[in-house]
């Protein structure tokens, strides 16, 4: 489904990602773990066209993403939940969710899609008319996830969903990630919280200073 091959990314003279290769197969949760500054977010930004690659390839269901404009990538069935949530703070919860459906040609199922998201995140339904900027960090993370689901993704790239959340909320968010996986959504999960990420992933890659240093079955890495 997603194949990253010999990918290198630089910011000027600084090499952020150094010749990494990994795959995400349909139906998997694959985790990319590592410390802050390891190159995890840069990797996601390159996959989704926000940062140019220096070399390498990124193929998604036969499409070369490095040659695809970033506003077209969502139409291929890929959604990106960025680090820090990035909700539209002055818009209501429901308006934020509706923004997630902007790429869909057929808007006739909008209400059904909203009901689906509200079923997963009852708190968002309670706050649907509330400004997104007034939500807690956990609620904003739920909103970012719900907004991504509105585009009917086959694959979701999640960047640090646990960042800034209490342990209780982290468990809640990861429980929802499991539910999304059970619905058949493929997930590439970037996390500093290695224990939580490995506990739900099928496979994982460890990124250190821009290079993949370990890879394998998530449970085996968890016990390493």
Model-derived features: where do they sit?
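Glycine-rich phosphate-binding loops of nucleotide-dependent enzymes
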Residues: 1-224
